[in-house]
A protein has these predicted regions:
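C-terminal subregions of glycosyltransferases and related glycan-biosynthesis enzymes
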Residues: 147-151, 156, 171, 177-179, ...
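Nucleotide-sugar donor-binding/catalytic module of glycosyltransferases
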Residues: 1-217, 301
Length: 307
């Protein structure tokens, strides 16, 4: 939670009124400067929620590290963990439906439901991955394949239900600046234990202060982002090397993706070489979108203009 007083009560109500109550609810306040912490404390007291706890971070960790710490804590006991944002609204049967599917199928470690986006005043209209596919039944379960687009996270983290044993397994590979949805999506995709449910069980609020919408295209930010993606690809390779299973095809995808990232990094910090351009063209399908390389050129031109 961070400065969420505007939407918190709606989200808290949707958790409290689930048809299957959660065993416990863990909340971290990331040093909010509004009344978020006091609002939640009062809410817990008013509704007698003895299994709900809230703690305030000792400093502002940011949402990535905060989610990592909370998921680490939540996965101590065996069970199912539901990551939760501060501003969405859960359907009353979200826990019931997703828990039932996970408990019946041991091959699933991460289950993601569809989402129903809605926009507040000022909310920027963006592409929302994970909306209902009207061509499929609501109970359809898709098994995504680890391919050249493996880094593209197609569902938001607030739509996930995750077996705690899986969180414990991947926690040694988890760095503080890795987003929780990326960690959970990509590792379960790699293992073949990710499933996508077509049923919308969360109302996904979009507004002008969504953390996931705050993007920068300046050179420094793009270099940092590419560096983070390189580190992520390396930990995926480490997992492939350290765990049983046939990851030859997946490892090849990860290696090719790393080659493109290195070429993009050379473009931004040292100037593009012919060999780098060849790499980018050869493995172009590993770009998350056609805008990635264009954004690199824009950032490079912008940095040159500012000198």
């Amino acid at each position: 939670v961070y400065n969420g007083t505007r939407y918190l009560t709606e989200q808290l109500d949707s958790l409290r009124l689930q048809t299957v109550s959660p065993d416990r609810v863990l909340i971290a306040d990331d040093c909010s400067t509004d009344e978020s912490f006091d609002l939640i404390v009062k809410y817990i007291e008013e509704h007698g929620l003895g299994n709900w706890t809230i703690n305030k971070n000792r400093s502002n960790f940011g949402w990535r590290k905060s989610f990592k710490l909370l998921l680490d804590l939540a996965s101590i006991d065996d069970g199912i963990v539901f990551p939760c944002d501060q501003d969405d609204i859960w359907e009353p049967d979200k826990i019931a439906v997703m828990s039932s599917i996970l408990e019946k199928d041991p091959s699933i470690e991460v289950l993601s439901c569809a989402v129903e986006p809605f926009y507040e005043s000022g909310g920027k209209k963006v592409t929302v991955y994970g909306a209902v596919d009207d061509s499929k039944p609501l109970d359809d379960l898709e098994t995504p394949v680890f391919d050249s687009k493996f880094m593209l996270v197609r569902r938001p983290g607030c739509s996930y239900a995750v077996k705690s044993s899986f969180i414990r397994e991947i926690m040694p590979y988890w760095q503080d600046d890795f987003a929780h949805d990326g960690m959970l999506w990509r590792f379960s995709l790699l293992k073949g234990t990710l499933r996508l449910l077509n049923q919308p069980l969360i109302r996904f609020r979009r507004h002008d202060s969504n953390a996931t919408e705050m993007r920068h295209i300046d050179k420094k930010s793009r270099v940092a982002e590419i560096g983070m993606c390189l580190r992520f690809s390396k930990v995926l390779q480490e997992y492939c090397s350290s765990n049983p299973g046939d990851y030859r095809i997946s490892s090849a995808h990860i290696e090719h993706y790393g080659s493109v990232l290195n070429a993009r990094l050379h473009l931004l910090v040292g100037g593009l070489k012919i060999s780098d351009l060849g790499t980018i063209l050869k493995y172009r399908k590993y770009e998350l979108s056609n805008r990635s390389l264009l954004g690199d050129f824009k950032a490079l031109i912008s940095s040159c203009d500012s000198k």
